[in-house]
């Protein structure tokens, strides 16, 4: 009989077991108890992925034990973020109590409704279209176990915010759910997408619950002053950050054409490359040209709108989107290329009317073919930006690039796609939350003892650099780990 080895975390510690190939994790736990005489405690009920009771951590990700097939060397642990009662059983009572405080039922301002008023409450399918998208939750709590904002701040978690959204979107409910959402720290969510990634019912909590609820919350006047400052920036200069020096778009030419062209792209710069990280933008041009890619740079492009979509300010984001669509839809290029994870995710997922293809710069480089790079004898680790890894499903390309540089040693950190804490308006709106989440990321980076931290997102660059600096001082460490954009790295070896 062919077997796999799995490790189960019991109350007294980890223990390894041999189990037959082909079982689910739930089957394997039952097999272990029966075959080895163990008494591992775990929850289960329907065994069909409908009750949500069997969720556990499998290789550091929350999944349903009844729907996950055993693989060799899997590690099974109780859900993170909850007190453990015994073995794989966690205490769910705090969650249920919190749900109770959120008035988890439709409420009317006036319980006594006249027949005339009742007649006016007729609903049609379109009235509940937003509710339908988020009501399939089975309370497995997988999203809560993975949520960085819930772990490191006073944020109730994705599914509780989903519940508030469910009632806020229901015309029958008349309570001020937006005020409840604001009081429950809806702006603590980094929109990292971990909850979406692990949801067994594939509920898009980020886009269909949190961001839509933030839009309603903002319209009711429940907002953060710092988010309004970002709003002022874009209204005055079409960028989300203040201008500090000559912009990238002012410094460069309209186009950089190469002979024997493999591909022609339009460069969407984003706010940080244009106003803060001009040298990375110039590196991008050189790197693309070196790979046989011609670069067109539209000078009248504006902010992609991501900071405003994420924080509920959709009146601003729609205006910005319209301007960019008018510019980029007219271009005769193979693709629009982005150097920012947030910009790329926004263009790919939120620009529904686009007539152009969008690619991250690492996707472009791998597609046209990597070239022979000069050797570079350094050790690096890599951070997956949330809006690249989960927002665009791009994670192999950066690794292919790093592994193609001679003498460069690439090592993975513990959880490379763990959120750094900067996204979703959290760095500007809730800096203390961003700092708390960033501290864990810094710990993972320092544990690798790498010479450099490499990433692809300018926003992540800024925040991780700040997190590492604070971590260095807090722990009295002498070794600094600089943060470098993968394009800056390539500019050194082309």
Swiss-Prot record:
[4Fe-4S] cluster 1 binds at residues 137, 140, 143, 199. Residues 127-157, 178-208 form the 4Fe-4S ferredoxin-type domain. It comes from the Archaea. [2Fe-2S] cluster binds at residues 46, 51, 54, 66. InterPro entries: 2Fe-2S_ferredoxin-like_sf, 2Fe-2S_ferredoxin-type, 2Fe2S_fd_BS, 4Fe4S_Fe-S-bd, 4Fe4S_Fe_S_CS, Beta-grasp_dom_sf, Cys_rich_dom, Helical_ferredxn. CDD domains: fer2. Residues 4-82 form the 2Fe-2S ferredoxin-type domain. Keywords: 2Fe-2S, 4Fe-4S, Iron, Iron-sulfur, Metal-binding, Repeat. GO terms for molecular function: 2 iron, 2 sulfur cluster binding; 4 iron, 4 sulfur cluster binding; electron transfer activity; metal ion binding; oxidoreductase activity. [4Fe-4S] cluster 2 binds at residues 147, 189, 192, 195. GO terms for biological process: tricarboxylic acid cycle. Belongs to the succinate dehydrogenase/fumarate reductase iron-sulfur protein family. This is Uncharacterized iron-sulfur protein MMP1067.
